[in-house]
Each structure stands twice: as structure tokens, then as C-alpha cells.
Design a protein with these regions (language model features):
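Accessory, non-ATPase domains that flank or precede helicase/AAA+ motor cores in DNA-metabolism machines
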Residues: 2-396, 408-424, 706, 733, ...
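Inter-lobe coupling/hinge segments of SF2-like helicase ATPases
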Residues: 234-240, 244-247, 256-690, 717-722, ...
Length: 774
């Protein structure tokens, strides 16, 4: 069996290891014996929650040769669905009379290259997810149905083979019989072929009326591949010594797999390194894939790439229409797009001639999908690069502890950019204790003075608070009522524009109350601050200065966001106000002061990654200051200014702080020195969620005793957020020192879970390498 085949069957059929382990694909057969068939069996992955493939016979009417990676329309229960072919075989557990035939072959060739196909198989195995849903995730929405890849050409195919009965029925219709023979002999013909052969439209229509011939829409010819640039761009910047070393080192393996961690302080010129490496790949006719964590980064990134390169650049992210995403997917697959830039799902972009994959801001948790197929785009990018045999670059000023440990283990190559590029100097950091201060909408007088000083000098200021909305809480001063989401165990956030109460967890929107629903008092007040409330305060405090709020609420319009970016890049005095979105890779050379209003949230997080993420956010947002010759300063407000974590961040580098955290993780045997998996249930009642997890826990006991798996377990327990979107949530956390052991354990566990009868309305999921345990 070759590597393009999925060696899987029936219930949960895969097991796999991370990059340093070989992927083992096991064939798990049901208890009944397999039956040898004289003809071919086609195994199809269908989008369903079942971890298995399904056996079909080839189409009744001979069509194009069927290959792995092609879409087919098949009967599934009482409906027809679109699946993806994964392999052909000679045996099945089903008797011949129980097998159904494939209805239609939808593609002329596989939609996935061999390398991408194998990456998807690895992903289904590693993340313990149904293979049919994995393939569906990898396809644009329009290709998840019967839509052809590119609709342009009408063709005609025979529906029923020309046998004796058909031949007899057409004995008096010689033209129809002759045309039917032509179409059958060539499999499919277009209208020009029919016309040139001397047949009329009337004859063709008669065959279609008799259901002997059917019309299909198929893909047009491929677009021409991009033309490689013949010279370097005039916009190419000179490199410093560290950048030169990075470029030279990576180019040594420019035509083979290697994973590099480009660890550069903010403003060190990582993007220029990317671009010069891309220039080399484009000159050799190879495509490049660039992943960014947020849609908000895409306009700025795309603009810089299009200014720099004359070759076509396409964009792929969830903000595009289905038609636009399919168009970008086609250009990438055909090789007419030189550079594909996108967010998480762009890791599945097909590349005709791949040359390099870049993951910018590799530490960002946005690269991990939080529902459905819970994959990490960063980790998939590394595995895909390995399958494609191309280099992959993970860039960050605050690398994840996982990537740093992979460097220490010699799995990744560590390249450092320790100085800012050009004349830019690192900003100065100041920690301000506000525990005894009287604040005005979250600002100390000391901070307001510094803001005014920078604005008077015609500079720009960035104010950071990781809380969107107007205020995080609406409460009644008379009885203590608090506005809570009736679908979640969470408070509703007050929003001023548009006015209302919103749940940031499930999306519930309610009208803004004018009186307390408990005691009817009108004595309601908002507590806490969010970006909208701060925006109003800053506009009143600095009435002549533009205040640009950049958060998930304000940038829903791409045009509005691009307008704000243009205004910022003019380097006129303004105040940027935003959430975590502003910390990610933006280059704003006019900013000389960064203000962090509240740095305390990550200090007391229930998540073991809380301190790492807090350090990354503060370091990243601090890096927005001083990116030109004007210098910069960072003011961090805290009620716990003496806390060891904050003191370490201010007095040392991120690298030193990360080393400290790695030692803590090693001592506590937490990732990256172990592997976690999260089993979660959602049900209408908490009892049902916990009871089902208890059944899973009993299976785990049995596996641990009989198979000698060393797996630590926490739970079953209610999730920290017990109710979300109307469902009660329970969880069971698994931990193992060995990925090999964890994968084999999950493989067998998922088999047995699928054999359980889950209560109506209950859903269960497995999250391998979870980044959110809340």
C-alpha cells in the first residue's frame, strides 16, 4: 500500500506522532472477516462524525479514472453527499449486494497534491478527527458541494452504457445511436466536438430527453504560471549582520526541508528577511505561503508585499466571500499566484510549485482552531513543509515555549535578530504602581501627562487594554443584580456602539436595560472599562486629537480599517486605542509612547499558559514604540507592580523570562515537556455531561490497566466556564510524558467512545495540544 493511501477502516482508524515520531497508519478492521471482491472497491471519506471511510463500487457508467484526492458524489443513507476518494482496494467487509456505486466523479484530477494529501492524513491521525471533516475543512466552501473547480465549459456524458436493449431502442434513430456511440467512446464531449462531427442540437436534446446523456459543467483550462522576477526590487533594504546570517543560513537549504525559528526582537527586520528569502524562491519559479494570525494584519501585509513584488499576490481568509476564496484557491493551485497570504485556514492552500512556508507571529494562539477540527496551523505548516520538502520559517519576537524547546532539542534551527533594524532603538520601560492612585477612566495623572507631552511633540500614542466594549459589567446599586448571559455562565459586556449587552463567548445580544429586572430600580451603573468607554474619555480629554479605536468591533469594515491604517501611516498626531489585535506585527513608525492600562490580568490566570501569554502581549505591544529615529517609551500600569513576573519582564529580556518559564514547566512536567489532550462534553444538563465523561474515564481505567498506558487524568469535572451557548460543559484532561503513548491511547480510546451510546443532544470532542483549558 503506497503512502497516498489512507490505511484506515471502520472506527477511529489512525494513530500518529508529532514531527520527531514516524506517522503510523494502522488498518483497523471490524471483527467480521473481509471479503475479496473481483472488482475494484473505492474507499471514500465522507463529512460525518464517524472516524472511518466508506466502501463503494466504481460508477455504473465508466468515467474518468478515480484517484485519491478526487471528489465524488455518493449515496449516503437517504441522501447524496460529496466525499473525497482516499484509496482503492480489492476487499471489503460488506457483501457485494450491500455495496452501493459512486454516482458521479466530480473532478478530472485530484484536488490535493501528494504532499498536501499526506499532510491531511497525518492531521486526521494526529488530531484524532474524522477524515471526512478534515478534507472538508481543507476545501473552499464552494467545493464542498458538487460545484466544479472552475465552471467554464459544458460537456456531455453517457448516463447508460450502450447495450443491446439501448441499441435496439435506437434502431430507427441512427443519428442518435451514432452520437451516443461517439460520446461513449470519448467519455465526454463538448458542444464544438458534437457540432464538428456533424450532429445537430436537436439530436443531442433527444438523447438527453431519453436520459441517455447528461450535461455537466467542468473546469476550464488552467491559468498560466507566474513569471519569475528577473531582478531584485528597488525597495529592497540593506541588511545588518544578523539579518545577513539568517538569509544566508536559510538559503543553504532553500530546496529542502528545514525548520527555522527566526527569533527577532520587535523592529529587528524579520519582514525584510522574509522578503529577501521570498525573492530568491520567486526567481526560481517557486511559490511562497505566508501565514499571519489575524485578518487585521492582512491588509498591511498584503500592501507591503504587493509594493515589493511584481508577481501576483492572493489573499485567503474568512472575511472573503466564498467566490473570492475559491478564486484565490484556484490561482494558488494553478501556480498563477506567486505568493499566498492568509490566516489559519490558508495552511491548506494548494501550491503548484511550493518553495517556502512562513508563519509570522508563530506564538499566537489564533493559529489554533478552537472548535470542529481543532488543528494548529503552525504545527501543520511544519508538517506540510516536511511533506513538501521545503523550508519553513517560524517568526516571532516572543517565541512560544514549544518552539524554543524544539530549538534546544535540535528539531528547529534557532536564528536570532537581537537588534532593531536601521536607526531604531529599543524603548525604555517604566512600571507605574497604581494601587494607591486615583484613576480617571483607567489613567493615572502621571500617564496622562506623558501622553500630552508626546502629542505636543507631534508624535503618536498607543493605548492598550485587552477588553473591548464599553464596560465589562452592568449592575444594580440597589439590589446587586448583575447582567449575565442566560446562555453562558458569564457576564454580559456593555457596548455603546451599537448600544446593547453582548456576550463575548457565545455572541448573545440583549437590549441595554434602563431598569433592574429584579427590583425595577433605575439605579444602574457600569463597572470597569473597555475600549469604547476609554475612547469617549480620550476624545473629551484631547478634543483636537484623532482617537482611532482598533478592536474586533471597529474593524468589521475592511475599508474603514484600511482608512485608519492610512491615517496612522501619515504619522500625524493621533491616539491609537486597541486590544490584543494591535500587538500583532503592525509597523507604526510614528508611535513614541505605548501605554498598557492594566497589566495584571495574566498574573492570576487559571491557565498554566497565563504568564507566558501575558509576557508575549506586553513585549509585543511594547515593541510598537520607537520604531523610527524618534525613540520610544512604554508605561505599564499595575496594582501589583512588585510582582516577580512584572519585575522580571521590565528588568530582563523576553528570552531570559522564557528560560525561567521553561524551567518551571519542566519541574511541573507540563508542555512542552509533556503532552495534553482535552476531552470535553456538552449537554443540556451538567449531569449528562459528567456522566458520559465518567464512562470515558472508566474506559481509560481499563486501557491503563490492560494496555499499561501511563496517562495522568484530571476529572471528570465541570469546565471552568460551566455553561456556554446554552450547553453545560464537562471536561477530562489527559497528560502523558510521551507523545507516542498519548497517541496510541487516544486512538484506542476514541474507538471505544464511538461504541458508547451518547444521550440525545450530547456532543463530545477531543482537543490534542489544547491552548485553552477554560
Amino acid at each position: 500500500m503506497n503512502e497516498r493511501q489512507v490505511v484506515c477502516y471502520d472506527v477511529c482508524i489512525y494513530t500518529a506522532m508529532l514531527s520527531r515520531f514516524k506517522v503510523f497508519l494502522k488498518k483497523s478492521m471490524p471483527l467480521n472477516e473481509t471479503i475479496k471482491h473481483h472488482g475494484l472497491i473505492i474507499r471514500v471519506a465522507i463529512p460525518s462524525p464517524l472516524r472511518r471511510v466508506f466502501d463503494y463500487l466504481p460508477p455504473i457508467v465508466e468515467q474518468l479514472s478515480i484517484k485519491p484526492g478526487m471528489r465524488v458524489r455518493v449515496p449516503f443513507g437517504k441522501r447524496e453527499v460529496v466525499g473525497v476518494v482516499v484509496e482503492s482496494a480489492q476487499d471489503s467487509t460488506l457483501l457485494p449486494n450491500r455495496l452501493k456505486s459512486i454516482g458521479t466523479v466530480l473532478d478530472r484530477e485530484p484536488l490535493f497534491s501528494s504532499a498536501l494529501f499526506r499532510t491531511l492524513l497525518w492531521a486526521a491521525a494526529y488530531y484524532q478527527h474524522p477524515i471526512g471533516e478534515v478534507f472538508q475543512t481543507a476545501l473552499p466552501v464552494k467545493l464542498r458541494s458538487t460545484e466544479p473547480v472552475k465552471v467554464d465549459t459544458t460537456v456531455y456524458r453517457v448516463l447508460i452504457p450502450l447495450d443491446g436493449d439501448i441499441s435496439t431502442s435506437l434502431k430507427q434513430a441512427k443519428k442518435q445511436k451514432s452520437l451516443l456511440e461517439l460520446i461513449e467512446s470519448e467519455f465526454e464531449v463538448n458542444e464544438n466536438r458534437i457540432k464538428n462531427a456533424g450532429y445537430s442540437r436537436r439530436t443531442l436534446n433527444q438523447l438527453m430527453e431519453k436520459n441517455l446523456v447528461k450535461r455537466y459543467m467542468v473546469a476550464s483550462e488552467r491559468a498560466a504560471k507566474f513569471k519569475p522576477p528577473t531582478s531584485a526590487s528597488e525597495l529592497q533594504l540593506p541588511l545588518n549582520d544578523a539579518q545577513k546570517v539568517a538569509v544566508k543560513t536559510i538559503l543553504k537549504s532553500s530546496d529542502s526541508y528545514a525548520c527555522y525559528l527566526l527569533d527577532g526582537v520587535t523592529g529587528s527586520g524579520k519582514t525584510e528577511v522574509y522578503m529577501q528569502l521570498i525573492q530568491h524562491q520567486l526567481a526560481n519559479g517557486r511559490q511562497c505561503l505566508v501565514l499571519v494570525p489575524e485578518i487585521g494584519l492582512t491588509p498591511q501585509t498584503v500592501s507591503r508585499f504587493r509594493e515589493r513584488f511584481t508577481c501576483p499576490v492572493v489573499v485567503m481568509h474568512s472575511g472573503l466571500s466564498d467566490a473570492a476564496r475559491l478564486d484565490a484557491w484556484n490561482h494558488s493551485r494553478e501556480g498563477s499566484a506567486a505568493i499566498t497570504i492568509g490566516t489559519r485556514s490558508a495552511v491548506f492552500a494548494p501550491l503548484a510549485n511550493p518553495g517556502m512556508i512562513i508563519v509570522d507571529e508563530e506564538h499566537d494562539t489564533s493559529f489554533k482552531q478552537q472548535d470542529g477540527f481543532r488543528y494548529s496551523a503552525r504545527d501543520l505548516a511544519v508538517m506540510r513543509a516536511k511533506k513538501e520538502n521545503v523550508p519553513v520559517i517560524l517568526g516571532s519576537a516572543t517565541p512560544s515555549l514549544e518552539s524554543l524547546q524544539n530549538c534546544k532539542a535540535n528539531k528547529f534551527k534557532h536564528l536570532r535578530l537581537g537588534e532593531r533594524a536601521g536607526v531604531a532603538q529599543p524603548p525604555t520601560l517604566e512600571l507605574v504602581d497604581i494601587s494607591q492612585s486615583i484613576l480617571e477612566s483607567g489613567f493615572s495623572e502621571q500617564l496622562l501627562f506623558k501622553i500630552q507631552k508626546q502629542l505636543n511633540a507631534n508624535n503618536q500614542v498607543l493605548v492598550f487594554i485587552n477588553r473591548r466594549g464599553f464596560a465589562p459589567m452592568l449592575t444594580c446599586n440597589s439590589c446587586g443584580w448583575i447582567a449575565e448571559c442566560n446562555q453562558c455562565i458569564a457576564q454580559l459586556t456593555v457596548h455603546a456602539k451599537p448600544p446593547g449587552l453582548r456576550c463575548h463567548h457565545c455572541g448573545t445580544i440583549e437590549k441595554l436595560s434602563t431598569s433592574c429586572p429584579t427590583c425595577n430600580s433605575s439605579n444602574l451603573t457600569t463597572l470597569g472599562i473597555g475600549t469604547q468607554k476609554i475612547e469617549l474619555f480620550l476624545k473629551k480629554r484631547f478634543p483636537l486629537i484623532p482617537v482611532l479605536r482598533i478592536d474586533g468591533d471597529s474593524i468589521r469594515s475592511r475599508k474603514r480599517f484600511e482608512t485608519m491604517l492610512e491615517q496612522i501611516n501619515r504619522r500625524e498626531p493621533c491616539i491609537l486605542l486597541g486590544t490584543q489585535m494591535l500587538t500583532k506585527g503592525h509597523h507604526f513608525p510614528g508611535i513614541t509612547l505605548v501605554a498598557v492600562l492594566d497589566a495584571d490580568a495574566g498574573l492570576f490566570s487559571a491557565d498554566f499558559r497565563g504568564q507566558e501569554q501575558m509576557a508575549q502581549i506586553i513585549t509585543q505591544v511594547s515593541g510598537r514604540a520607537g520604531r523610527s529615529d524618534r525613540g520610544g517609551q512604554v508605561v505599564i500600569q499595575s496594582r501589583h507592580a512588585g510582582h516577580q513576573t512584572l519585575q522580571s519582564l521590565v528588568q530582563s529580556t523576553y528570552a531570559e523570562f522564557a528560560d525561567f518559564l521553561l524551567k518551571e514547566r519542566k519541574n511541573s512536567a507540563m508542555p512542552p515537556f509533556s503532552q495534553l489532550a482535552l476531552l470535553r462534553t456538552e449537554a443540556k444538563e451538567m449531569k449528562a455531561a459528567i456522566d458520559f465523561l465518567s464512562s470515558i474515564n472508566s474506559i481509560s481505567d481499563d486501557l491503563s490497566i490492560n494496555k499499561q498506558f501511563e496517562i495522568d487524568r484530571i476529572g471528570p469535572i465541570p469546565a471552568p466556564m460551566e455553561k456556554r451557548a446554552g450547553k453545560f460543559r464537562g471536561q477530562l484532561i489527559l497528560k502523558s510524558a510521551s507523545r507516542l503513548v498519548m497517541q496510541e491511547f487516544l486512538f484506542q480510546l476514541c474507538q471505544r467512545i464511538e461504541a458508547l451510546r451518547a444521550p440525545a443532544g450530547l456532543r463530545w470532542s477531543v482537543d490534542v495540544d489544547p491552548v485553552d483549558l477554560i
